[in-house]
Regions:
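N-terminal topogenic module of multi-pass integral membrane proteins
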Residues: 1-66, 242
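Membrane-interfacial loop-to-transmembrane alpha-helix junctions, especially the N-terminal start
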Residues: 38-50, 98-106, 150-162
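Alpha-helical transmembrane segments and their membrane-interface exit regions
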Residues: 50-56, 76-85, 141-145, 166-169, ...
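Aromatic-anchored segments of alpha-helical transmembrane domains
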Residues: 51-59, 109-119, 162-174, 227-233
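Membrane-proximal helix-loop-helix units in multi-pass membrane proteins
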Residues: 68-145, 150-151
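Loop-to-transmembrane alpha-helix initiation sites
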Residues: 70-74, 174-190
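Membrane-interfacial, low-structure loops and terminal tails that flank and connect transmembrane helices
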Residues: 200-217
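Juxtamembrane boundary at the C-terminal end of a transmembrane helix
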Residues: 231-242
Length: 242
């Protein structure tokens, strides 16, 4: 647990200026997407996701979380999601078309990166040892929220990877005493339901790239592989604490 919060403090201390820059770009693109969703804005948002996910993979996990026993597998996981967004950018599948049906949950999740540090400070924590807006769970909640606001024809593979990640957060609430992740895990359940509801109500399962059966097998392979590795590393961490 000490290593977990120590790496977070080191990450925040060294990168807080970069995090502010990343957040400002995200705020700008989100406002532009809501007010004037032109093609260049949509492309810019996808590039932003690719860049931010790569940042989490390389800077957060590979560099600053190198002391953690499971950093490499999570770095790979985020690299996979960055590649998935790159594929989506090139294929043009996710349309980022506005869908006002899920505004309440969507806006709540989009604002969650700012709620995370407030929640940490409410627990008596102080900077730099707090959750920040450019950390994995904050980025995931923001992405899920944005995709809910623009849920017409979304990339199901990316959505399921995001929801899979949010469930991983449940384990961290116990092992690393980080109840902030309950916010992510609890919000992902209704979000996943709404995504599938939209998916089948609009018959998107008939127009999926890659094809539905390939998405299914790919998702199963990725989730099983990551699940096995994470379960093993979490058991190791529990054994160390015993």
């Amino acid at each position: 647990m000490n290593t977990f919060w120590k790496t977070i403090a080191e990450y925040n201390s060294a990168t807080w200026m970069y995090q502010i820059f990343i957040v400002l770009i995200g705020v700008f693109l989100t406002l532009m997407l809501l007010r004037n969703p032109q093609r260049w804005v949509k492309i810019g948002m996808k590039i932003y996701f690719i860049s931010t996910y790569t940042w989490i993979s390389v800077v957060y996990y590979h560099i600053y979380c190198s002391e953690r026993s499971y950093n490499n597998v999570l770095s790979i996981f985020w690299a996979i999601m960055a590649i998935a967004w790159l594929w989506d950018l090139l294929a043009g599948y996710t349309q980022l078309e506005r869908n006002p049906k899920y505004n309440v949950l969507g806006y709540l999740l989009v604002l969650m990166p700012f709620i995370y540090p407030v929640f940490s400070m409410a627990r008596g924590l102080s900077f730099p040892g707090i959750t920040s807006p450019v950390m994995p769970c904050s980025v995931v909640t923001f992405t899920i929220g944005l995709l809910l606001l623009f849920s017409r024809k979304s990339n199901l593979f990316i959505i399921l990877l995001l929801c899979h990640w949010s469930l991983i957060g449940l384990s961290k609430t116990y092992f690393f005493k980080i109840p902030e992740d309950f916010l992510l895990a609890s919000a992902s359940v209704p979000a996943l339901y709404l995504f599938f509801k939209e998916y089948y109500l609009t018959d998107l399962h008939k127009d999926t790239k890659p094809k539905a059966k390939f998405i299914n097998w790919l998702l199963i392979a990725v989730c099983v592989g990551i699940g096995i590795v994470l379960t093993t590393t979490l058991v190791i961490e529990l054994y160390k604490d015993a």
